[in-house]
From Swiss-Prot:
Catalytic site: 134, 241
Name this polypeptide is given: Endo-1,4-beta-xylanase B
Summary of activators and inhibitors of this protein: Completely inhibited by Ag(2+), Cu(2+), Hg(2+), Mn(2+), Pb(2+) and Sn(2+). Strongly inhibited by Fe(2+) and Zn(2+). Co(2+) and Ni(2+) cause little inhibition while Ca(2+) and Mg(2+) do not affect enzyme activity, and Ba(2+) produces a small stimulating effect. Irreversibly inactivated by SDS in vitro.
Gene designation: xynB
Entry keyword annotation includes Acetylation: no
SUPFAM superfamilies: (Trans)glycosidases
PANTHER family given in the database record: ENDO-1,4-BETA-XYLANASE A, GLYCOSYL HYDROLASE
Species: Paenibacillus barcinonensis
Record keywords, A-Z: Carbohydrate metabolism, Cytoplasm, Glycosidase, Hydrolase, Polysaccharide degradation, Xylan degradation
UniProt GO cellular component terms: cytoplasm
Amino acid sequence: MSTEIPSLSASYANSFKIGAAVHTRMLQTEGEFIAKHYNSVTAENQMKFEEVHPREHEYTFEAADEIVDFAVARGIGVRGHTLVWHNQTPAWMFEDASGGTASREMMLSRLKQHIDTVVGRYKDQIYAWDVVNEAIEDKTDLIMRDTKWLRLLGEDYLVQAFNMAHEADPNALLFYNDYNETDPVKREKIYNLVRSLLDQGAPVHGIGMQGHWNIHGPSMDEIRQAIERYASLDVQLHVTELDLSVFRHEDQRTDLTEPTAEMAELQQKRYEDIFGLFREYRSNITSVTFWGVADNYTWLDNFPVRGRKNWPFVFDTELQPKDSFWRIIGQD
């Protein structure tokens, strides 16, 4: 690894943390690289409900422990992801002993035990938790996503979850996290939800803007308006899952073996503009996490087109800095 390449996180030391989503295999193969460029890590999947709590009386913390131990040993922050989500939650959470629907009381008891155990295990080691993930509906005529959490617990499940997480670790920053967060309609739904939670006294310390964007959109104005709207609630903002796909969402092509020159140039300019904007709001934005480490691995290789390579980050498939890296480095 070239020593002449400056550390990405060090170059933003006066602005915000620079993070990456990781899994345990990466720590073994890319640990030195991760430690050089990132001062925050998020478990991409290995802290999700079904990963750490597959059966009611069984917890599997080996992978999560490995990530936390790696980070703590190197002075790297950890974001916890995620406690309450409609995906990757095991069926037993919503069922009683006979396979019927669990009662509200049973679910609240289970949720508290889960949060107490998971958050409590990493107390004072995880600086922020995505407590509730993606509870807002994308369709314009609905507000809350229709999930088992909502159907069985009612809307106050969010308040309950935040209160439980705060009890388990009073020092952790607690976030509501969502995608399409720059869309004006969904933006207002997220704003109103978090404002309502705050009005109810819920310990919500921040909003997670996922940042699954592409080289064409959303517009810089939409990103700026979302930042300003959320910041007006006087909460911290984290960009939690940043990647810039080289494809529009509706683009189904599968024939590219590398990005076109136009894609690469658009991505460089977008990264430069976006990080300039983030830096402008560094009093509000305290952490920016990429949803991966480098182009050698990204969830976008299988979404929305399965098996299609994507190149969404500032490091290439060989862990070398792309031109976009040099566009955003040294902006502090």
